[in-house]
């Protein structure tokens, strides 16, 4: 079957019909089977926020005479056939293990009798799917995701079932190659629509409408706002358009597209940061009645727009706004079936939205993978009801893990996302924090550098803050900690800690000889968890100095506690500690952990000779609660560092040379004395300059 290929020119340039591009696709952001933000992350942390999509490439169109049309296609093109009406899916969930499979499930559920037209978008891209949702809405067509070079057997089977007269491949020049187009053309004629920018893509979708509308819902370049505009257009018989609304004037191409719809009213969907007041004024000057709907909270905003549906909906599509492909599918389904779409947390239904759905007598259709949208959403369980249950479940699981070990545990876990789950056991019990107390000293010194009252070259005693701050966290050096406490004073550091809300944290008095570590310092896991929570949220220091302290914690070398209880590759920033007390060896650790859907902080202090592996087990339990079970946890080499060059080995810090450590050798660091690290190298235990070592 020969594909009908259409190239849409860049704005202002003539176009030409030609085969689809065969060059390799430009890399775009992708999601693994279990999505991760990026991480962009992203990536809200707050839930990890949606990563900023990579701008799409601009294909160059060379003006040429119109090509000859093959004889077999010489007749006048027919008007697009009306689409088959979509139905509201009967089930509570459109899940599946991948976005490709999820789109197929949505197609089967909403278009059981087939479809005249099918819209396909590159499912490895992050921008095209949402823009394609608008086209699917305007053509009353299902939306499927494919890869640039071909289609899976599942998608092929669904296309055969739908039996479309036309498949529309909607994307940039790089979104489809020759193999992908040929695979589609083997099923039905392909209409290839290419675009070079978000506004252009949206105008093309708008122009595909065959019926006039009274109202156009206009959004800026934010994809979530555009998806909400698509949904609102579907429930109110309007149309949606995405524009570059940051400027002060409206492009002529945009005005022409709006005028072709026959609309007299425009509703701006989003704040002035997306569509400026000057831009809205330009629309009014062109003769449109302009109003605006906006809210800084995407969950509240989606509810606000869903309330505009004229009738009590049969169902609400619920999606996680952090998963762009589910946002696209939700918008397409919403518009096709005339049912509103709402955004919600991944753990439960946003409480105010739950109340509205309950009042309407409607049901929920969850669109998303279970790990990114839990079943409590399908049940319309309000977060106010789900949060206590989740907190109790986490506490029970942590207690069960702790019960496997002798000793006494104190711990606090706080989720940093929207729900802010929190649980603790003996979280307010004052205990010796061991080396975790160094976080307070590091903060106090960095705050002075940030404020300009000290510099990186300031020497509390014999070593600069540049060196002291690094080794105090990286290798848990006690000497630099003592130096900073002597410099600032234990009473002042206590006041600083308590000014941060650490009401149960205080330093003892620095002895004339000996370390502050044994001076009777006290803190709680509640205080320590609250400290790193504020650090991660940027509430303690400027972004620059927040990053510096967090990087120290991320790169510290004693990672056999919390860091060894989470999956490989998961970001953690931690500060462990250990101290001999009367009941035996105290073990502690406090960490920030960033998972795929949210982040959490955890602080643990265990007494009575508890092994480090117990802290790893508690971290694993917490991680599993938030993100699901996983296989082997991360492991770190006993020899944490590697020499970068030949360096003298010494009998003591700065002492006599007893040999040479060659470059490129792995070594185990056991302790530190300011710039000097004590290492095990083979059978030798010696001291070397830490600047000759790097993390493995």
Question: What is each model feature region?
Answer:
Residues 76-386:
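Extracellular glycan-binding segments that recognize GlcNAc-based cell-wall polysaccharides
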Residues 131, 135, 430-456, 472, ...:
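Active-site SXXK
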Residues 140-145, 340, 447-466, 542-543:
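Short, well-structured active-site flanking segments
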Residues 384-429, 621, 625:
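Beta-lactamase-like hydrolase cores
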Residues 408, 481-540:
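Mid-domain, small-residue-enriched loop/turn segments at the edges of structured enzyme/sensor domains
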Residues 560-616, 620-627:
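Short, Gly/Ser/Thr-enriched beta-strand-loop segments that form substrate-interacting elements
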Residues 628-636, 680-696:
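Boundary regions of SH3-family modules and the immediately adjacent low-complexity/disordered segments
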Residues 660-691:
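SH3/SH3-like beta-barrel superfamily modules
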């Amino acid at each position: 079957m020969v594909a009908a290929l259409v190239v849409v020119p860049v704005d202002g340039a003539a176009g030409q019909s030609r085969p689809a591009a065969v060059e390799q696709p430009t890399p775009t952001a992708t999601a693994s089977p279990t999505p991760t933000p990026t991480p962009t992350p992203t990536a809200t942390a707050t839930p990890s926020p949606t990563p900023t999509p990579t701008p799409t490439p601009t294909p160059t169109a060379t003006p040429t005479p119109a090509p000859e049309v093959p004889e077999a296609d010489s007749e006048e093109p027919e008007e697009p056939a009306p689409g088959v009406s979509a139905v509201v899916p009967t089930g509570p969930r459109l899940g599946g293990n991948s976005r490709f499979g999820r789109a197929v499930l949505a197609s089967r559920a909403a278009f059981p009798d087939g479809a005249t037209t099918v819209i396909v978008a590159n499912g490895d891209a992050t921008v095209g799917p949402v823009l394609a949702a608008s086209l699917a809405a305007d053509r009353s067509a299902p939306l499927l995701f494919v890869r640039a070079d071909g289609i899976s057997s599942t998608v092929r089977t669904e296309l055969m079932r739908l039996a479309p007269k036309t498949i529309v491949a909607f994307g940039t020049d790089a979104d489809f190659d020759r193999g992908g187009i040929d695979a589609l053309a083997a099923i039905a004629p392909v209409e290839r629509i290419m675009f070079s920018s978000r506004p252009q893509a949206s105008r093309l979708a708008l122009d595909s409408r065959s019926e006039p509308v009274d109202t156009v819902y206009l959004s800026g370049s934010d994809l979530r706002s555009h998806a909400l505009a698509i949904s609102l257009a579907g429930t109110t018989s309007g149309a949606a358009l995405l524009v570059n609304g940051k400027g002060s004037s409206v492009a002529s191409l945009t005005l022409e597209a709006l005028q072709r719809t026959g609309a007299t009213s425009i509703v701006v969907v989003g704040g002035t940061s997306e569509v400026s007041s000057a831009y809205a004024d330009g629309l009014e000057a062109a003769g449109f009645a302009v109003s605006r709907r906006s809210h800084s909270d995407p969950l509240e905003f989606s509810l606000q727009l869903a309330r505009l549906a004229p009738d009590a909906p049969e169902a609400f599509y619920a999606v996680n706004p952090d998963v762009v492909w589910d946002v696209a599918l939700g918008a397409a389904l919403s518009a096709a079936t005339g049912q509103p779409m709402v955004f919600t947390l991944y753990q439960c239904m946003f409480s105010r939205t739950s109340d509205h759905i309950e009042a309407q007598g409607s049901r929920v259709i969850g669109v998303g993978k279970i790990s990114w949208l839990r079943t409590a959403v399908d049940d319309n369980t309000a977060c106010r009801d789900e949060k206590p249950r989740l907190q109790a479940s986490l506490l029970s699981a942590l207690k069960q893990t702790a019960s496997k070990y002798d000793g006494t545990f104190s711990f606090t876990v706080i989720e940093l996302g929207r729900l802010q789950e929190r649980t603790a056991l003996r979280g307010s019990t004052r205990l010796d924090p061991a080396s975790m107390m160094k976080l307070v000293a590091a903060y106090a010194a960095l705050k002075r550098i940030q404020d300009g009252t000290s510099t990186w070259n300031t020497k509390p005693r014999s070593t600069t803050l540049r060196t002291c701050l690094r080794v105090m966290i990286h290798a848990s050096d006690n000497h630099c900690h003592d130096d900073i406490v002597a410099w600032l004073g234990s009473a002042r550091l206590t006041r600083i800690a308590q000014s941060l809300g650490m009401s149960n944290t205080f330093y003892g008095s620095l002895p004339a000889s000996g370390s502050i570590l044994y001076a009777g310092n006290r803190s709680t896991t509640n205080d320590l968890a609250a400290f790193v929570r504020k650090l991660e949220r940027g509430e303690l220091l400027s972004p620059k100095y927040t990053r510096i302290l967090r990087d120290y914690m991320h790169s510290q070398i004693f990672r056999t506690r919390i860091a060894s209880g989470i999956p490989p590759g998961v970001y953690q920033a931690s500060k462990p500690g250990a101290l001999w007390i009367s009941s035996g060896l105290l073990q502690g650790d406090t960490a920030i952990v960033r998972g795929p859907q949210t982040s959490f902080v955890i602080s643990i202090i265990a007494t009575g000779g508890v092994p480090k592996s117990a802290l790893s087990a508690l971290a694993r339990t917490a991680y599993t609660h938030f993100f699901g079970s996983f296989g082997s946890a991360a492991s770190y080499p006993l020899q944490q560092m590697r020499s970068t060059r030949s360096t003298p080995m010494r009998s003591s810090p700065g002492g006599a040379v007893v040999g040479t450590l060659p470059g490129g050798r792995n070594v185990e660091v056991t302790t530190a004395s300011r710039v000097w690290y004590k290492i095990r190298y083979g059978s030798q235990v010696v001291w070397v300059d830490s600047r000759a070592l790097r993390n493995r």
